């Protein structure tokens, strides 16, 4: 999106330095980096700024910054979005056995009108740890025919799959999802079994 303005929030200045010095990111772009914690960024805010897309990519399967998973943080994001704005989260979990992702989804549903879950193909039918994308928005997007193909690690082209809303509600109930708040967010406990299965 060459005509867009992009704000990148990266807590580690060394990562920003590597992007410019080693990965060839030109300083002559519309990308502006803020070296600070993401929650502090949204608390301070930029006057008059509303985002069309916010991407959360801090959940790596090894650690869980709990303060970025709570209802209070989700509300900060919701307040920062444009009317058709979308919050995308990249999450690693075991769909069939994990409690981390269902609790994040359940918490998002307390703030956003629409929450959807996507994965490559139908990975939720397998018993394994996988990467998922959670989409939270107040706008009524039509995802019914969403089948954008993506290249798998094995080199196979597969469509993204979406778990239907009714099935998602059943999933949250079956997985005993909990509301994550600033006062109660046991994300490290939820992630521990994932770490054990990944043997990290």
What are these regions (language model features)?
Residues 114-200:
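Soluble small-group transferase modules, centered on the S-adenosyl donor enzyme superfamily
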Residues 1-88, 95-101, 109-111:
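The AdoMet/dcAdoMet-binding core of the Class I SAM-like
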Residues 103-107, 132:
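Alpha-helical scaffold elements adjacent to nucleotide-binding pockets in ATP/GTP-utilizing enzyme cores
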Residues 13, 93, 138-140:
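Non-catalytic surface loops within mature trypsin-like serine protease
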Residues 93-96, 123:
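Short histidine/acidic/glycine/proline-rich micro-motifs that form metal-
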């Amino acid at each position: 999106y060459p005509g867009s303005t992009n704000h990148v929030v990266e807590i580690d200045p060394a990562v920003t330095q590597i992007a410019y010095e080693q990965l060839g990111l030109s300083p002559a772009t519309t990308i502006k980096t803020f070296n600070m914690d993401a929650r502090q960024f949204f608390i301070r805010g930029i006057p008059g700024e509303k985002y069309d897309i916010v991407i959360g990519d801090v959940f790596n399967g090894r650690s869980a910054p709990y303060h970025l998973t709570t209802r209070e943080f989700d509300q900060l994001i919701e307040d920062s979005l444009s009317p058709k704005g979308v919050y995308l989260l990249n999450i690693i979990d075991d769909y069939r056995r994990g409690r981390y992702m269902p609790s994040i989804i359940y918490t998002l549903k307390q703030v956003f009108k629409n929450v959807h879950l996507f994965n490559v193909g139908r990975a939720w039918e397998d018993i394994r740890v996988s990467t998922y994308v959670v989409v939270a928005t107040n706008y009524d997007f039509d995802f019914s025919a969403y089948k954008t193909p993506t290249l798998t690690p094995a080199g196979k082209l597969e469509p993204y799959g979406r778990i239907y809303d009714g099935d998602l509600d059943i999933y949250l109930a079956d997985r005993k999802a909990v509301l994550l708040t600033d006062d109660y967010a046991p994300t490290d406990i939820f992630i521990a079994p994932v770490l054990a299965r990944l043997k990290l």
